[in-house]
């Protein structure tokens, strides 16, 4: 049985190349805005359906379909740069996010040994740069603990 079916999530290594990770992170950091009233999480910046990330979702679609053995329809893209102190509360996704992917682009931590996991159910998963987790967003509760770093440090994620 596939890990997506068994565990409700599947870790995928090297879903994005290092060059693509660098390009996307550089783009997002240049366009960083903090304090957006629409951001439900403290200490974060985000964009929904920005042109570049919408293109990325379509670029990643064949890989995600291959990994899931499903024909999928992209609904939206979401890009977030979490800053120190951010937290993602435990939740399940809305119906449109039946199959989701969370891809770590890049991060900058005060301590190079620090790890900030995405928790799937009761399992903390450290997603390395360029890797991703495909998951059943409506079925498995997921969250992140408090990002225990000073505000000038960050973690960049694509959904």
Which residues fall in each region the model found?
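Conserved active-site beta-strand element of glycosyltransferases/polysaccharide synthases
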Residues: 81
């Amino acid at each position: 049985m596939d890990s997506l079916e068994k565990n409700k999530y599947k870790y995928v290594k090297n879903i994005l190349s290092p060059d693509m990770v660098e390009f996307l992170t550089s783009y997002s950091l240049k366009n960083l805005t903090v304090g957006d009233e629409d951001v439900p999480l403290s200490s974060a910046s985000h964009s929904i359906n920005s042109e570049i990330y919408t293109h990325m979702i379509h670029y990643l679609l064949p890989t995600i379909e291959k990994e899931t053995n499903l024909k999928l329809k992209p609904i939206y893209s979401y890009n977030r740069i979490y800053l120190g102190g951010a937290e993602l509360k435990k939740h399940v996704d809305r119906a449109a996010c039946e199959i989701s992917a969370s891809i770590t682009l890049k991060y900058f931590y005060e301590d190079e040994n620090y790890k900030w996991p995405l928790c799937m159910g009761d399992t903390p998963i450290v997603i390395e740069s360029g890797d991703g987790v495909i998951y059943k967003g409506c079925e498995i509760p997921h969250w992140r603990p408090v990002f225990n770093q000073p505000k000038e440090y960050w973690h960049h994620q694509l959904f």
